[in-house]
Curated annotation (Swiss-Prot):
It comes from the Eukaryota. It comes from Giardia intestinalis (strain ATCC 50803 / WB clone C6) (Giardia lamblia). It is found in: Endoplasmic reticulum membrane. Coiled coil: none annotated. The lineage of its organism: Eukaryota, Metamonada, Diplomonadida, Hexamitidae, Giardiinae. This is Protein SEY1 homolog. Its EC number is 3.6.5.-.
Length: 1035
């Protein structure tokens, strides 16, 4: 397909033409829209348009000689013509405006000539430079300036873009020399080539000098005069048509085919290139396919996502409507004996409206159609760009699927909770009333807040109000009666109805194995054994077969077998449970007459909770096993079970918090006391403290919770639940039901190696390895447990642990985890240990910032200035002071460095490295401390010097005193003589004269020098000072 007329790409004003965009849009839908771009430029009126018309049969406007030489082509004109080559089926011809025109010179708009040259060089596969023969050697007339522009833009932008797109061929420059003659053609070619190489060397970076032929290919056409040598001209044109086809096939080659874009996309690329060129920005031109691929892939992405959103919106509306209809129904209680109760069940109606399997298939089909549409329309574009948008499309499609699936799951969850609410209403009323009772709150608060702190026992005792716990035991009994009331024939038939409508899918027991191959179809799940479970849309549940309550456990198991829901493993477990002493007692709502002794109160409580919850699970659990649409559906927790767990959990939390609060108090105070010692064993001591606190808290929690459970569930005379001894001492059920006689290891050894409670292990083994794999089918949503094998009949199969969280069963196992040494205690002690570590780190940090600066000053001041009794210290010499100072300073610096971090190593606990503060803060504190240390050092020196003079002259004074004592008679005689009196009067007169003739500053300075000279026994200094003072007095 070609254009019938010439279309402007760039207008005379320098704008991108809207006509070209319209033409490209009209090319949309062409099977192969690729093309080769050929452009021609040269001086004005050099015959460019005429040459194109003769070569390609176009009709570009040519110059009218009668009107004079004027500008004919303005901007860039284009036309697409069919031209079959090995590379593309058509050629896009660009007729560029002539250079050096009078009109552009008058408009002072010669810059557009450069822009057109840049644009043509950027988009063309073949450049034709049209030049007159007689202009060879002239700079402007021969288009040398255009060649300089081509070389410049090529190495700044085009080379990088061509290499990025995989195009390593040289750019073809076809020089058309007009009005040429055969004579002198060879000389003309050499001259032109020499000029081109010279321009090349001047225009390109130095690293490309001498490599012209690696990047450009020059071809010459010598075309005779069209008017005066008509026949030769026509022959040459015919020859050139063949020549240009060979150029397309050979010189362009296969590399060009991989970089071409559809003609319909060329307007996008050309418009972007023109905007860059016109604004004189630094050209960073990506490959054609890259820029167009990004734009087109975005368009096709939007188209695909719009189609998907529209179709999914309809499905979403249908699902929403079905949910609204379902939730709008009045839910019936399944404790009634109405045969029609199951037909009104909200979940049944919801699945009749939108079956989960069929919904999944519809959504998957819509998503696949969306992706296929995008892939089909983007197959010709760059794979990297296609993948980027495909990833975004995939994310948006998944978001759309999740929106519908979330709505579906929300409807199922709300419907399930609506039905469970009717069943658990009596229990919820009772437990709500129990939780709202406040008569025990004061006693509870007093018992939790008045805890004696003892180290290392940490806490002496922790008790709770006995009335509250006795009341809780009565509430558990009421809950048991509610659960028992829920076991009715209607529940069994409800399971059957749910199975037939697709809510609960359980494969027959023969198909439970790791090799089952499940294929989802429109209305069935088919396995490799040929069996199937019907998933009928709109299927009505069958009528109940029995309408009476269960009077005994045998009738219950007989009726539940008729539903065909549970596996033989579950039948065997339930039957063994019902025949046990406690099972019969629970069924008849009474206790055994002569219960045996019990040795482990924890096991008794664990078994009580587990059996109550398991019995409850057998009636409620199937409602949780809904098809796995979203993760939210894994967390459908029955309200009654949640309240039960929360009640017991709150009691444990209260005990744990009381213990934890004491550990925090002990940790903070003991860490501060340890830090004040400040020795090299700081972190060793803190590690030991951590171990003492940890072990004390552990013992306290065990003792407190043991007291709590035993006082709540076991009578003081050890009667009540003592009949559980039979169950506790009996052989493990899983060995009788599920393992070969040669099996010697428990299946939970590899999964729960730390669990030591036999009851906990017994029920965990049964439910992990027999009941759950049968109940939580279909198999594709399960994973294997390596190294553990179960027996089914005579063949051994690998056990399967499904991805489902059967919340009631998990809650039951969590209740049995009240076996303190392994489950609840371990979890709590991890938190206690974390608090101990955090508080040690925090307390050391606070000690460092608040108390340690005083420690630094007090220690060195005490060490240098005062002794332990508070008296001033005496030293032998100044060197001893310096040695003591440096030694103490080194010790304080080492002490400060301890706060940079250390390891708490505790027996039976993992080692922990803590960092109370940073090295920067330590350095800053030491810098501040050193200034005070220097003052303390100078103070010690001053004290030493003072004491030194005192010690030196004390014997002189003592001798003088003894001498005066011995010669006191002669001293009195001298003092009373007339000579002494004269000398005294003379000295007083001199002193008075000095006082009057000198200033106080002069006297102080002189007397200070005199005193120093006397102290240092410097006679010369003494006489000099005396002489200067006499001179000041005389003058």
């Amino acid at each position: 397909m070609s254009s019938k007329t010439e279309i402007p790409i760039i207008t005379d004003e320098g704008d991108f033409s809207a006509e070209y965009e319209t033409f490209c849009q009209a090319m949309n839908g062409v099977a192969d829209g690729t093309f080769i771009c050929v452009s021609v430029f040269g001086p004005q009126s050099s015959g460019k348009s005429t040459l194109l018309n003769d070569l390609f049969g176009t009709s570009f406007k040519t110059m009218d000689l009668s009107a004079g030489r004027t500008q004919t082509t303005k901007g860039i004109m284009a036309r697409a013509v069919d031209f079959q080559t090995k590379v593309a089926p058509r050629v896009l011809i660009l007729d560029c405006e002539g250079s050096d025109s009078r009109e552009r010179n008058q408009q002072e708009a010669q810059n557009i000539e450069r822009h057109i040259g840049c644009f043509a060089a950027a988009v063309s596969d073949l450049l034709i430079i049209n030049v007159w023969n007689h202009d060879i050697g002239r700079h402007s007339a021969a288009n040398y300036n255009i060649l300089s522009t081509i070389f410049d833009i090529y190495f700044r932008s085009l080379l990088k873009a061509r290499r990025k797109s995989g195009n390593h061929r040289p750019l073809i420059l076809l020089i058309a020399i007009r009005d040429a003659e055969e004579d002198g053609a060879e000389l003309t070619q050499r001259t032109f080539e020499s000029d081109v190489h010279h321009i090349y060397e001047q225009s390109v970076p130095k690293q490309y000098h001498g490599s012209f032929r690696d990047y450009f290919c020059l071809r010459f056409w010598f075309i005779p005069h069209r008017r005066y040598m008509k026949s030769l001209y026509d022959e040459k044109i015919t020859q050139l048509k063949t020549d240009i086809k060979e150029i397309f096939d050979s010189l362009l080659g296969a590399e060009t085919a991989t970089t071409l874009i559809p003609l319909t996309d060329s307007s996008i690329y050309y418009n972007n290139i023109w905007d860059i060129v016109r604004t004189d920005k630094d050209l960073d031109i990506p490959s054609q396919r890259e820029i167009v691929s990004n734009i087109r892939c975005e368009e096709f992405y939007l188209e695909a996502i719009e189609q998907f959103s529209s179709q999914v919106g309809k499905v979403f509306a249908d699902v929403t409507a079905a949910i609204q209809v379902s939730l709008g129904q009045q839910s019936s209680t399944f404790l009634e004996q109405s045969p029609d109760a199951v037909k009104d069940y909200p979940i049944t109606k919801l699945h009749n409206a939108c079956n989960s399997f069929k919904l999944t298939k519809v959504l998957m089909d819509l998503s696949q159609e969306c992706v296929a549409l995008y892939r089909r329309k983007t197959r010709h574009y760059i794979p990297k760009v296609v993948t980027q948008w495909a990833t975004k499309l995939n994310d948006d499609v998944l978001a759309g699927l999740k929106k519908v699936a979330h709505s579906f799951a929300k409807g199922i969850r709300e419907s399930t909770c609506q039905a469970l609410g009717a069943v658990t209403a009596p229990f919820r009323v009772q437990i709500t009333q129990w939780l709202e009772r406040h008569e025990y709150s004061d006693d509870y608060a007093s018992n939790t807040n008045t805890v004696d702190i003892l180290v290392p026992d940490l806490i002496s005792d922790l008790t709770f109000p006995q009335k509250r716990l006795t009341d809780l035991m009565g509430l558990l009994g009421a809950a048991t009666r509610v659960f028992h009331k829920c076991i009715s024939v209607n529940w069994a038939h409800e399971y059957s109805g749910l199975c037939d409508t697709g809510i609960l899918v359980n494969l027959p027991p023969n198909d439970v194995g790791p090799n089952s191959n499940v294929r989802i179809g429109d209305n069935a799940i088919e396995t490799n054994a040929g069996s199937s479970v019907r998933l009928s849309v709109g299927y009505e549940a069958s009528e109940p077969m029995v309408d009476a309550h269960i009077d005994d456990s045998g009738a219950f198991f007989s009726d539940i077998r008729q539903t065909g829901v549970y596996s033989p493993h579950l039948y065997a477990f339930l039957e063994s449970l019902s025949l046990s002493t406690y099972g019969k007692a629970l069924s008849l709502q009474k206790l055994p007459a002569a219960p045996p002794d019990v040795a482990n109160a924890y096991d008794a409580v664990c078994l009580l909770h587990t059996i109550i919850l398991l019995w409850y699970c057998e009636t409620m659990m199937p409602l949780s096993l809904i098809y796995d649409i979203t993760p939210e559906i894994d967390h459908v927790i029955p309200e009654s079970n949640a309240l039960f767990c929360e009640t017991m959990g709150s009691i444990l939390a209260a005990v744990a918090e009381a213990v934890s609060s004491q550990t925090r108090t002990i940790t903070a105070s003991m860490t501060q006391a340890t830090a004040r010692l400040m020795d090299d064993k700081l972190y060793v001591t803190l590690g030991s403290l951590r171990g003492v606190i940890y072990e004390s808290a552990r013992k306290t929690l065990e003792r407190s919770f043991f007291s709590l459970l035993s006082s709540a569930f076991v009578a003081p005379d050890h009667q009540g639940l003592l009949y559980l001894q039979t169950r506790l001492s009996s052989p493990s059920i899983y060995f009788d039901l599920h393992f070969d006689s040669s099996s010697r290891s428990s299946p939970t050894d590899s999964i729960l190696p730390d669990t030591q409670n036999p009851v906990y292990k017994q029920y965990t083994d049964i439910y992990l390895f027999s009941t759950l794999p049968a109940l939580l089918s279909p198999l594709p949503r399960a994973y294997n447990t390596v190294g553990t094998r179960l027996s089914s009949g005579s063949s051994s199969i690998q056990s399967l642990l499904p991805r489902y969280r059967a919340v009631p069963i998990v809650a039951a196992l969590d209740m049995s985890a009240f076996y303190i040494p392994q489950a609840a205690l371990s979890s709590f002690m991890d938190r206690v240990d974390a608090e101990i570590i955090e508080l040690i780190n925090k307390s050391l940090g606070e000690f460092f910032s608040k108390s340690f600066p005083l420690v630094l000053q007090n220690k060195i001041h005490t060490k240098l200035v005062y002794d332990d009794q508070g008296a001033q210290r005496s030293y032998i010499s100044e060197n001893s002071i310096l040695t003591e100072f440096l030694s103490e300073k080194k010790g304080l610096i080492s002490m400060a460095q301890l706060f940079e971090g250390g390891t708490l190593i505790t027996e039976n606990l993992h080692s922990v490295t803590i960092k109370p503060t940073s090295q920067e803060k330590i350095d800053a504190m030491l810098r501040c401390a050193e200034a005070e240390w220097d003052k303390t050092y100078q103070e010690a020196l001053e004290i030493y010097r003072t004491n030194k003079h005192k010690d030196k002259y004390k014997w002189v004074w003592l001798g003088l005193c003894v001498f005066l004592m011995l010669t006191r008679k002669w001293v009195y005689a001298v003092l009373l003589s007339k000579y002494c009196l004269c000398i005294t009067i003379l000295l007083l007169s001199v002193g008075l004269f000095v006082y009057q003739r000198t200033t106080p500053d002069e006297r102080n300075a002189s007397f200070s020098i005199v005193a120093t000279s006397i102290r240092e026994r410097d006679v010369g200094q003494f006489w000099d000072a005396t002489k200067r003072l006499a001179q000041k007095v005389i003058h």
